[in-house]
Amino acid sequence: MRTLRQIAAVSGVAFALAAASAAAHAEKITIMVGGATKIIYLPAKLTEQLGYFKDEGLDVEILSQPAGVDAENELLAGAVQGVVGFYDHTIDLQSKGKEVQALVVFGQVPGEVEMVSTKAADSLKSMADVKGKTLGVTGLGSSTSFLTQYLAQRAGVPSTQYTMLPVGADNSFIAAVKQGRIDAGMTTEPTVSQLLKTGDAKVLVDMRNVEGTRAALGGTYPASSFYVQRAWAEAHKDEAAKLSHAFAKTLNFIATHSAEDIAAQMPKDYYGNNKDLYVGALKASLPMFTKDGKMPADGPDTVLKVLSAFNPSVKGKHIDLAKTYTNDYVSAPVKTASK
């Protein structure tokens, strides 16, 4: 007669094989990330590394696109099923007649930092000093461009009095600072920590935490998120729920583990030869993440306020914020991450 231990062992193997089989037969889901190595989008790759997609029986491919605007275009073209990018794209797209909704909110704040070049720091001590300056953004029409304009406006400087230059992110942003092509610019970790370490730039506005974001924007600003076309979610409710559960488990993992633990899960090419710098950047960024993937109550209104000020597509339009996100898929109980 079999012992309980033998039965449990056989059952465990059977379950593992069943999960592997389910993933093998699952329809591939492709997710485009607006810059996969950015820490604001950390949950995308971390979910894959932790095996949470496979645990849900999903076959997910993560692709990277430097700018969120381009990732959005891939989604609308049907080339990818989901995007990890800024929540504000869902509002912008609704103004253009496209129904896209965020299923999981990663960041309750932008995680963005306005950095000022050390060369320009003496004459640029706040956003009130950007008149006549060149400000770097990832791309024109990007989330960073709207945030930059809003910060300047709050400081009393209209968008006609400075220049925005699209310089991308990561190494291209660093090059723009070093070459003196921009006086200041908006970027994220780990680029922020790299510039601080080399002494090429200083922090001007810090939106990596709730306090700094409320001071800069007047409220929380949900940013990094996982969004899909509304029609896709309704036609693939099971997959949408499983994806949301996988991401929610990752957010729980982030909330319950140290920066060192998280960094240990990431591929080496995410931190290169400077793991300590990456861990430091992670520590500075951890407060930005939600613990459960749900939309902060005051978030959508703040985002709409920013977009209504500078996005010509949104300005003057009626936006139904309730259609830009849903907590339905992450509301179901999710097992606590223990890996």
Task: Indicate where each model-derived feature is located.
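Bacterial N-terminal signal peptides that target proteins for export
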Residues: 1-11
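Boundary at the C-terminal end of the N-terminal hydrophobic targeting segment
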Residues: 22-26
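Short, solvent-exposed loop/beta-turn-alpha elements that line the ligand-binding surface or hinge
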Residues: 126, 209-219, 286-296
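Pocket-lining segment of extracytoplasmic ligand-binding domains
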Residues: 172-267
